[in-house]
Curated annotation (Swiss-Prot):
EC code: 5.4.2.9
Function: Formation of a carbon-phosphorus bond by converting phosphoenolpyruvate (PEP) to phosphonopyruvate (P-Pyr).
Region of interest: Disordered: 1-23
SUPFAM superfamilies recorded: Phosphoenolpyruvate/pyruvate domain
Organism from which the protein derives: Streptomyces viridochromogenes (strain DSM 40736 / JCM 4977 / BCRC 1201 / Tue 494)
Protein name per Swiss-Prot or TrEMBL: Phosphoenolpyruvate phosphomutase
Active site, UniProt feature: 69 (nucleophile)
Amino acid sequence: MNATERPGSDGTGSPESVGSRLKNLLHGPGTCQLMGVHDGLSARIAVAEGFEALWASGLCMSTARGVRDSDEASWTELLTLVGTMTEAAPGAPVLVDGDTGYGNFNTARPSPPAPSCLGAAGVCFEDKVFPKMNSFFGDGHQLAPIGEFSGKIKACKDTQRDPGFVVVARTEALISNLPMEEALTRAHAYVEAVADGLFIHSRMSTPQQIAEFMRQWDGSAPILIAPTTYHRPSLDDFAALGIAGCIWANHSMRAAFSAMRDVCQQIRADRGIFGVEERVAPLKEIFGLLDYESLEQDENRYTQAPDLAPVQG
């Protein structure tokens, strides 16, 4: 059994892929939580704190690279970060933010095999045109034609090698201030293109648009949301609406951003570190999370073994 598999949930002991596990979470009772991560450390922390699934956020990975969330980081660069996540949190389903797929169906369809080989559970594509802009910045969010994006989703499903791999279609219709009817039309078209799930995005300060969408949705595919701007409702509130997956998309990165900025300001102002020591994680906690102790045990096992007699030949 490899790092992307675990014993099956049916009691047979057959391995369950991370993609199949993500599907089970999205089709199971309640609302699955996906914690936004951007590198191996953030993934390890999220899993250690009990999150069952992870969201490899395009915004957060781009920010970690020091560039804007406007397709400035290449797919290859983002996959490098995804690899650190799956290595740091083996067995945890990682849904990768694939942005627009970096072009048309032909540039997008290699996307499922690449993250799948890295141990990711799935990839999510949005129906903006390439290059995209982050959904929370500006108003110039142009969408691809429905048929064109549906073809992109179908091409990706036809290309995937692992039958359990998840392809999620994300519509930005509400972000683009289009009517609810357009969001529903796009959602139904993407399900017909065999998307495994739908990500419905909104940037209102309340969940009103999401609630209205769910009232009209026929339940033909699980719905995921990212309540970044409508942050007051709880997970139970979203479960009552019938939401399958809730993505806490960027809060680890934003927390790290604030903490790093504040510590830098304090050290520069104090001309020393005496004012920040109580605000930063003890090295002992970091060593514990990354399991330094097992390395020490392995060193004792492999470097202090008795010398073996040379082979005579």
